[in-house]
Amino acid sequence: MRQPEFELLDARFARYAMGNVHLERLYTGCRWSEGPAYFPAGRYLVWSDIPNDRLMRWDETDGSVSVFQQPAWNANGHAVDRQGRLIGCEHRGRCVSRIEHDGHRTVLADAFDGRRLNSPNDVVVKSDGSIWFTDPTYGICLLYTSPSPRD
């Protein structure tokens, strides 16, 4: 069943659309939102506002939106690990980092084979706890990334 909130550009997708799903806009004050990660234990969602170099937080209990972290190293993709910590791909930091429960940032990976990462973009945490991420070169050329040349 097609709902007015969704525009299906390919009729074949209709079989995947659930009739009981609706869209809800949570916030409009970002320039470019990406990388949502949900924390079920805390009932909140975080996402990146990449050009504004901040992570935003939406509280499911009261609907409020606040800044979760700033600066955020122009973080992009996120995931939550098995211990409930935020894993993030940082364009400016050229690394994959983790925000600890006390708020401190730990760099998990910033190089491979002796070369700096380019522009980590998306990340998932596998059920065994291993972290998989993409590292394309295109983000390194954007204005808000590290000024260091591509490795």
PLM regions and their residue ranges:
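Blade/loop signatures of beta-propeller domains
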Residues: 1-21
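Beta-rich, blade/repeat-based domains predominating
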Residues: 22, 28-43, 71-90, 95, ...
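A short beta-strand motif characteristic of beta-propeller blades
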Residues: 23-27, 64-68, 106-112
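Short loop/turn segments immediately following the C-termini of beta-strands
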Residues: 50, 91, 136
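Structural signal for beta-propeller blades
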Residues: 53-55, 94-96, 141
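Short loop/turn segments that connect beta-strands within beta-propeller blades
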Residues: 59-62, 100-103
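A generic, well-ordered mixed alpha/beta core segment in the N-terminal half of proteins
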Residues: 95-98, 104-110
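Conserved small/polar residues in nucleotide/adenosyl-binding loops
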Residues: 144-151
